[in-house]
Amino acid sequence: MNNRSLFALLVSLALAPLAGAAEPPAEKFDVVIKGGMVYDGTGEKPRVIDVAIRGDRIAGLENFSAEQAKTVIDAKGLAVAPGFINMLSWSTESLIEDGRSQSEIREGVTTEIMGEGYSMGPLNDRMKERMVHDQGDIKYEIKWNTLSEYLRYLEQHGVSCNVASFVGATTIRDFVIGLEDKQPTPEQLEQMRELVRKEMEAGALGIGTSLIYPPAFYAKTEELIELCKVAAKYKGKYISHMRSEGNQLLQAIDELLRISKEANIPAEIYHIKAAGQPNWNKADAMLAKIEDAQKAGLKITADMYTYTAAGTGLDACLPPWTEDGGYPALFKRLRDPATREKIKAEVQTPTDTWENLYLAAGSPDKILLSGFKSEKLKPLTGKSLAEVAKMRGKDPIDTAMDLIAEDESRIDTIYFLMSEENVKKEIVKPWISFGSDEASQAPEGNFMKSNCHPRAYGCFVRVLGKYTRDEKVLTLEQAIRKLSGLPATNLGLDHRGFLQKGMFADVVVFDPATVGDRATFEKPHQYAVGMKHVFVNGAQVLKDGEHTGAKPGRALWGPGKL
């Protein structure tokens, strides 16, 4: 070999590694969602781009080749968005029955937030015994004591959605005081504060209240402020079903603002509304009061459901003193003729001292009975209180008292209380997110033994279909922000709510042209349509509109967790 040939060989050998470095092997991903219109959860305009998933994280947003992925999803013509967050879930028991969370997943919900007043911990033996006694169609063992133990139980049991919870102020009160109408002693209040501290350090999101219901109704504002001061130290939030959504709506907002200010804690209003036709004209003042507080520096937000009917118990027709001492005391009172006459007189009398949903509905034909504990009464499911009263030949109020006593439960009930005009006024507000105020459901098994509110199947897709595509109340980027990025930010959820590199891969793919709700008040057990694919922590839970059976959901924790 001459010198020139030797020199050429040495040069080629030296350059070989550089040539290889110029073209590194293509990065590999578990999933690439190709060609979809990507809405990142910020509210910014969408863009057509690919989304790559590796493990439980979003690995990148750019143009990838199909060869780079084990699985490729063709999303051309479809919307790709962060998974939705249900700010008010009552799936506390339904997830034990069926961890697949079918109705939620088929709407694109990937995280369920619990804890409206009552939470699944902390519990003592007395509370556990009562919970077992009060169980309806869903039966389960209580294998936990604290709220964090319950969330870990769900995770180990297997759930398709992520789960997180506020600690219920009612649960804290019940643990220490019981169900009686009395105020805590200084020692009891300190015990309540200590329970809050332990749950916040274990990962609770903050304090949740439901102040129209006994025994929460018995708590004074000062008690709530003291509990919230503890939660605030752990960057928690106060979230409330306020003391009134009707006659005393504006005063109830004042109470929430006072708690937020004095405890130095962000506050959120559950299912914001002006309930009862005489109060519909308060919606503008309600929204203005909140926005004035925001301008003054308070961190106030809200959530809502997308229907004009509320759902709670038939016992919400009765004055709160009837439940002093709990349900056994209520049932005893309802069987006493003299006490019944007193109750009936109070139900018929307009008042500002308690939230009377019988009068707020305006008529017993706007009170729909949706779920009974007793097999004997289940045939009445789906009938109005007016219909049942006529069947029995009795006054509607007497009928309501009879039914509660016979069923020995609060009886699931739907009340038609709100105006569509106000729903639209609320839905456009950039600080309002969404919560179903329902349990996850499925059109099978124990779930078919009662009629849920249709919001269990349709709350979130109704935002995308009815209010965005059809009525154009929102743009799609606005709607998706309110379903994902906004609640994730409000809750301080770590690396959730946005489609960005490094975020957890909670991702939904849906057809904007067909997405929508099918559930009705007459036939609520009907899945939403238009949701194509759903990923939770990188695992595919919905594929081509069908549940895969995967249960990759995790317990999520508040920012104060130690």
Model-identified regions with their sequence ranges:
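Bacterial N-terminal signal peptides
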Residues: 8-17
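Bacterial N-terminal signal peptides that target proteins for export
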Residues: 1-8
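Divalent-metal coordination cores built from histidine and acidic residues
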Residues: 75-80, 84-85, 89, 95-206, ...
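Divalent metal-binding pocket/active-site signature
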Residues: 198-255
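Acidic, glycine-enriched loop/beta-strand segments at the rims
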Residues: 38-50, 411-418, 422-423, 471-481, ...
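Active-site neighborhoods of metal-dependent hydrolases
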Residues: 150-154, 159-186, 190-213, 228, ...
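Histidine-rich, glycine-flanked metal-binding segment
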Residues: 23-29, 38, 42-83, 98, ...
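C-terminal cap of metal-dependent C-N hydrolases
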Residues: 36, 336, 425-431, 437, ...
